[in-house]
Amino acid sequence: MVDTKDLINLETSLSNPFGNFGDDFSAQNVVSIDKKLLIDLHQLSLGPVLSEGPYSVVYEGLYKSVPVAIKIIQPDMSANVSPERKQKFQREVTLLAKVKHDNIVKFIGACMEPSLILVTELMRGGTLQKYLWNTRPHCPDLKFSLSFALGISRAMEYLHANGIIHRDLKPSNLLLTEDKTIIKLADFGLAREEAEAEMTTEAGTYRWMAPEMFSIEPIKIGVKKHYNHKVDVYSFSMILWELLTNSTPFKGRSNIVVAYATATKMRPSTETIPSDIEPLLSSCWAEDPAERPEFEQISDFLENILRNVCASSTSSPNIFEPEHSTSKELTNSPAMNCLMDQHVENSKKKNRTSCCCFRSACDNSL
């Protein structure tokens, strides 16, 4: 039974997402970008539109005769771009220019005048979201899904190791190469560098947002909800679930219902999830952020699972290997130790019903 009072509190929170969660935006701050990151507008050529959103349009184009993706912020009203939007653009450019990883889109340059323009490498395979939509109702091959999940985990492992929280991890922000063998993380507009103080602003997209970013209790003015980098782990769990089921989490439900479901411990059904992988999902979407594993642990676990899947098959998927090895010693996490123990047990006895050693999904799973 849904508590009407809880829904009212949630609706107030969702209608004013930035009101009581801290002040990431400040209109008084001057927006500036390192000149080394700026490129000459006259060296850009626009091609066909790749995608269009409420605040930007992405084109295929050329920079010095090299194919690129060109994102223009609010092209129809460039003279009236809000200070908040300019600051978001500055953060995205600054952070994207810092990161260099094989599973993160490559930054090429930016322009400030006459419009805000971000130029990155061109990913001709489109978004993961579009790929999944186009293949429904069929589920991707398990090796394919796991290799993509591993690529995402490696990208997030790199970001967290460098103190960066993405905060908007979802299929539409994951891009594919033309041959669909490599996946890369994009859109750093909501990303932040994790300071000593925890993050306090609600951000992200509701279906992939962690429960600690919602509240079914009224929040007093001046009181802030705190969260840390583990919100990305929760978002990853939803993407992994999508890769394994090719379904949208909480499909057909409004933002307010999704927020209520998440805040009250409801999770998508794991009925069709392979028993070896279900414990990973349950740990990643645990209500308590402290119970969620780090991405380093997730990468190691996925590597082991993928290795076993490939060994039992006659052919192996195209798995992208980064320059550095991720076969690192696992941190001494009780949650991940339990997860690995469960995986070993499942490998020994395939027909045994999987017993999740983390927080179980809500009995009223959606």
Task: Report each predicted region and the residues it spans.
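A conserved loop-to-beta-strand element in the N-lobe of protein kinase catalytic cores
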Residues: 113-121, 129
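Short beta-strand micro-motifs within the conserved protein kinase catalytic domain, predominantly
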Residues: 106-114
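Catalytic-loop of the protein kinase fold
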Residues: 160-176
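Regulatory alphaC helix of protein kinase catalytic domains
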Residues: 89, 93-94
